[in-house]
Structure formats: C-alpha cells, structure tokens
C-alpha cells in the first residue's frame, strides 16, 4: 500500500506490476544516460573556445544522430511490446467477475456463482473503526483467491469511470455500453486499495476500491456463506 511522503511505486503484488516496474527502471536508465550526454555537450559548448569550421557538413555526425536515436527507440519499444502483450493475455481464467461503475459506487457480480453480487460503497469518516483508512474503506470488499488467474470485466452504468488498483498494475476504463476486460493474479494475500481514476462527477473522490486477496479455501468458505 501507499505511505505518506512516498515517492516511488507501491510494492508489486502481481507479475504484471513487476514487469511494469522493470520497464520503468529500464526506461529511466535510458533517460538518465541521454540527459547526462546532453548536459555534457552543453557544458562543453559553453566552456570551450574551439571552433569546428566544417560543422555544417559532417556526414559522420549526421549518421550518428540518426542511427543512435533509432537504436534507443528499439531498446524502449521491445520491452514495451512484451509488457503490453503480457497485460492483454488472458489464459483460462478460473474466475470471472463483472465490475460496474456507478455514480458513485462500484458493484461486483461473480458470474461463476448464482446470486453472488453486491454493491460496494465508501465508509464515511464518522463510521470508521480504529486503524481503518479514511476515504479508502468500503462496506463490501471484493474478495478474490490468491495465485489463481482472475478475469475482471469492467463497464459502467452511467458515465466514464476507471477501475484502478496500483499495487496490482491494474487500470481499466469503465465505459457505458462497452465491456473491457483485464486479468489479475495476486502473488500474496492481503488488502489492496484503489480508487476511481476518471473524473466522474461531484463525488468522484469517494469511489474507493478494496480487494481482499485470500487463500483459495478461505475464498470458497466466503463464497459459500454468501451464495
């Protein structure tokens, strides 16, 4: 989860988020090298008094600044494509959940179970218990099993919303009349928080998302008690 004054990403909870963190570090390293080279050239130009009279027609230099950016773009594009394909790949999900955005709450329907559906509203500040997080707690959490592929279908009943859980690397737009899908696999149990990430009206800030990831046997007990 996030902490006060945190500058980095949340700890990765899924393979997708781990890939995103690796890609971020890879891209940041390339940006750092480019920035260092540009700053070095600027300092060199500001401090040196030497003049190259043939600078206007140097084919070697033109080849370098054409080929080098192409190589850099390839180094960025290849891992980017790998991560994108990994995020879109859905192989035999063992559970499918339909998530609907409303103004201003979420509703969840476990399509593999009969009559297992509920709405999820934010708990107001005056109703919080000791240790609960302000603007992040809900009355009904989305409970999922760990270490199993889960498909989440996302749509909206009214306006644009966005279902996002940063520690799992998830952010999917909820669009009225359209069904988007995303897959998630949690590597450890716990509580994971998210929020609506698309401005959707006056109470946009009051649409938290809470995922409770538990071992499979506890999930089966929970689903049996509600179904």
UniProtKB/Swiss-Prot annotation:
PROSITE patterns according to UniProt: COX2 (PS00078), COX2_CUA (PS50857), COX2_TM (PS50999)
Cofactor descriptive note: Binds a dinuclear copper A center per subunit.
GO molecular function, one term: copper ion binding
Cofactor(s) essential for the protein: Cu cation
InterPro entries named in the record: CcO_II, CcO_II-like_C, CcO_II_C, Copper_CuA, Cupredoxin, Cyt_c_oxidase_su2, Cyt_c_oxidase_su2_TM_dom, Cyt_c_oxidase_su2_TM_sf
CDD domains, A to Z: CcO_II_C (cd13912)
Topological relation to the membrane, as annotated: Multi-pass membrane protein
Keywords, comma-separated and alphabetical: Copper, Electron transport, Extinct organism protein, Magnesium, Membrane, Metal-binding, Mitochondrion, Mitochondrion inner membrane, Phosphoprotein, Respiratory chain, Translocase, Transmembrane, Transmembrane helix, Transport
Segments on the Mitochondrial intermembrane side according to the record's topology features: 1-14, 88-227
Record's subcellular location: Mitochondrion inner membrane
Residues that bind Mg(2+): 198
Record field: catalytic activity: 4 Fe(II)-[cytochrome c] + O2 + 8 H(+)(in) = 4 Fe(III)-[cytochrome c] + 2 H2O + 4 H(+)(out)
Ranges of the Mitochondrial matrix topological domain: 46-59
Subunit structure as annotated in this protein's UniProt entry: Component of the cytochrome c oxidase (complex IV, CIV), a multisubunit enzyme composed of 14 subunits. The complex is composed of a catalytic core of 3 subunits MT-CO1, MT-CO2 and MT-CO3, encoded in the mitochondrial DNA, and 11 supernumerary subunits COX4I, COX5A, COX5B, COX6A, COX6B, COX6C, COX7A, COX7B, COX7C, COX8 and NDUFA4, which are encoded in the nuclear genome.
Its biological purpose: Component of the cytochrome c oxidase, the last enzyme in the mitochondrial electron transport chain which drives oxidative phosphorylation. The respiratory chain contains 3 multisubunit complexes succinate dehydrogenase (complex II, CII), ubiquinol-cytochrome c oxidoreductase (cytochrome b-c1 complex, complex III, CIII) and cytochrome c oxidase (complex IV, CIV), that cooperate to transfer electrons derived from NADH and succinate to molecular oxygen, creating an electrochemical gradient over the inner membrane that drives transmembrane transport and the ATP synthase.
Family per record: Belongs to the cytochrome c oxidase subunit 2 family.
Name assigned to this protein: Cytochrome c oxidase subunit 2
Organism expressing this protein natively: Mammuthus primigenius (Siberian woolly mammoth)
């Amino acid at each position: 989860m996030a902490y006060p004054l945190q500058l980095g990403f949340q700890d990765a909870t899924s393979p997708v988020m781990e890939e995103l963190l690796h890609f971020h570090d890879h891209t940041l390293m390339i940006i750092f090298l480019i920035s260092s080279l540009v700053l070095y050239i600027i300092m060199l130009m500001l401090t040196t008094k030497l003049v190259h009279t043939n600078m206007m027609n140097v084919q070697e230099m033109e080849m370098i600044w054409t080929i080098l950016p192409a190589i850099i773009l390839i180094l960025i594009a290849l891992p980017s494509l790998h991560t994108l394909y990994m995020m879109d790949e859905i192989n035999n999900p063992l559970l499918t959940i339909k998530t609907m955005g409303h103004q201003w709450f979420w509703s969840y329907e476990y399509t593999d179970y009969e009559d297992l559906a509920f709405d999820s509203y934010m708990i107001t500040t005056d109703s919080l218990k000791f240790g609960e997080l302000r603007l992040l707690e809900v009355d009904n959490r989305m409970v999922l099993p760990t270490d199993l592929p889960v498909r989440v279908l996302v749509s909206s009943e009214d306006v644009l919303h966005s279902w996002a859980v940063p520690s799992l690397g998830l952010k999917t737009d909820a669009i009225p009349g359209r069904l988007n899908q995303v897959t998630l696999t949690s590597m450890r149990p716990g509580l994971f928080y998210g929020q609506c990430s698309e401005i959707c009206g006056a109470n946009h800030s009051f649409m938290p998302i809470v995922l409770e990831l538990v071992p499979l046997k506890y999930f089966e007990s929970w689903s049996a008690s509600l179904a």
